[in-house]
Amino acid sequence: MRHACALLAALLLCPMSAMADEEPDIKFFYPVVTRRPVIERELETSFQHSKSREGRASQFSGALEWPITPWWQVEVEMPFAYRNPNDAASTAGPGNLELQNKFLLWKSVQHLVLVSGGFELRLPSGSERRGLGGEIAVEPFVTGGIGLGPFDVIAAIAYEWNLNNVRGPREQELTADLAVGWPLSRWFTPFLELNTVSKIQGQEGEDAVKLRGRTQLYLTPGFNVRPLPGATFRMGVELPVSGRREFDYRIHAGLVWEF
């Protein structure tokens, strides 16, 4: 019975893989906040820096994205964080390890449409005591992209749950993002993102901005530059447009190598 099940799975998966290999790839630009629906094999380094009323924070990350099959991708990301609060000593060290599984749900080459879904798991490799992490969280998501005339449109929605007893500011959080890019040439694409964050549950200090039950709204203008074939540099600045905000600004930058 075991061998029969394995044979049946192979017969089902092989045609799917062959069809996916025969179809041309659908490429989209690289936002800095919104998740992409593309199944890809890449190395990426990224940097974030934000300023808020509590202080400043920076993060440098390295990530590997690897397709197990043409419709299943695994990503591993390891961040290194630096925190500089206004009322405490600065701290630095590794943050929470992030593991992501992404599955291609629908692909239409004719209509230039991709839809993917999956989940991200955050593991407590960061220090809770030093404010660098410590939470275990899971975040299911759905993301899709479509080519509309000269524009690429990408949308994503995700919900994060905290799974352990380390209570942080993001115990439950809903995010929804929309990104529009305009490829002006093969090497340059400007884009604009609309990013929303709704904190459903989470700790809030007495002097902190009250964000629970509120929807934060951010606009993120940015651009992609392809300095070399297979390499893309992306950069954007996330700016709040709502009264309730987690930060005053956040700078995103990253370099992606396709291989």
What is each of the regions a protein language model found here?
Residues M1-D25:
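Cleavable N-terminal export/targeting peptides
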